[in-house]
């Protein structure tokens, strides 16, 4: 069996990936100009900028922070990269947008980035694969020992609905109000190896799992395991991929700070010989559905005995509990933004409010999202 080496990584470092949709500033439609944008931002020898990259769809670019010790530093890095992208997109009349789904675009109008990897994915997944018109925020946290990675993954599943509800930003799909806060959460899990992770107890179990998938042709390597929360052996991190796309730097910072603090807390518990609290897989699955459906109004299961609480109350209390850790990690201001989201509304709530105030116009929803990304919530 092939062994998966877990790279050395400084403990509790942070890196953030932010996927951005390219939209016509006048119509709000998606525009497939990623190749042109990346070409102008690339290196002199024709390679992509190392921190501004392509994605599955040609209407998307991704900005990727370097590895940082604090969330504020990672956010500043991302904002600088977005500024570079705007130098190319602004003259073209193209705006940047980030929500987990585009409110009215149709999947069959979108062009795929030429890539053997993407061709293989779509050949296998067909209709479901073509539906992946989604944009997200991924947060990596450095793990200092390989054997801590899977307990951290399992522990973070307890807080999955908190992060899903806080970031939920996909109430619309192809012009329809889905009735869900995060339609994306239930769409993405249709892909093979996507969705909730298996709760493995040891690294050897994960290696056996990946080997089984490679042997049977499900994946070519571990990077094609697309769990919502996964170990990333290449970087020596745990990667949180459950969050919907977020349209402001403050919201990205809030979610990243919450993930940073939770992971650091669990690392400390593991140092003390205490495994993070985990929930039964059936509770984890139910929590994912509840957060996707009801967002911040979801009542979620918070303990192995089946105790339930309103997720917004959980988030408010959790933010206070983690405040000392946030101070130590240098992200107190960002973690406090969780309270702001609870007070002013998550993205899905703001989008629904804009649509209602404008006679159901989804073009106005796109306009509000692009304005948020450019100017913040004010």
From Swiss-Prot:
<comment type="function">
    <text>ATP-dependent carboxylate-amine ligase which exhibits weak glutamate--cysteine ligase activity.</text>
</comment>
<dbReference type="GO" id="GO:0005524">
    <property type="term" value="F:ATP binding"/>
</dbReference>
<dbReference type="GO" id="GO:0042398">
    <property type="term" value="P:modified amino acid biosynthetic process"/>
</dbReference>
<dbReference type="InterPro" id="IPR050141">
    <property type="entry name" value="GCL_type2/YbdK_subfam"/>
</dbReference>
<keyword id="KW-0067">ATP-binding</keyword>
<dbReference type="InterPro" id="IPR014746">
    <property type="entry name" value="Gln_synth/guanido_kin_cat_dom"/>
</dbReference>
<dbReference type="InterPro" id="IPR011793">
    <property type="entry name" value="YbdK"/>
</dbReference>
<keyword id="KW-0547">Nucleotide-binding</keyword>
<protein>
    <recommendedName>
        <fullName>Putative glutamate--cysteine ligase 2</fullName>
        <ecNumber>6.3.2.2</ecNumber>
    </recommendedName>
</protein>
<keyword id="KW-0436">Ligase</keyword>
<dbReference type="GO" id="GO:0004357">
    <property type="term" value="F:glutamate-cysteine ligase activity"/>
</dbReference>
<comment type="similarity">
    <text>Belongs to the glutamate--cysteine ligase type 2 family. YbdK subfamily.</text>
</comment>
<dbReference type="Pfam" id="PF04107">
    <property type="entry name" value="GCS2"/>
</dbReference>
<dbReference type="InterPro" id="IPR006336">
    <property type="entry name" value="GCS2"/>
</dbReference>
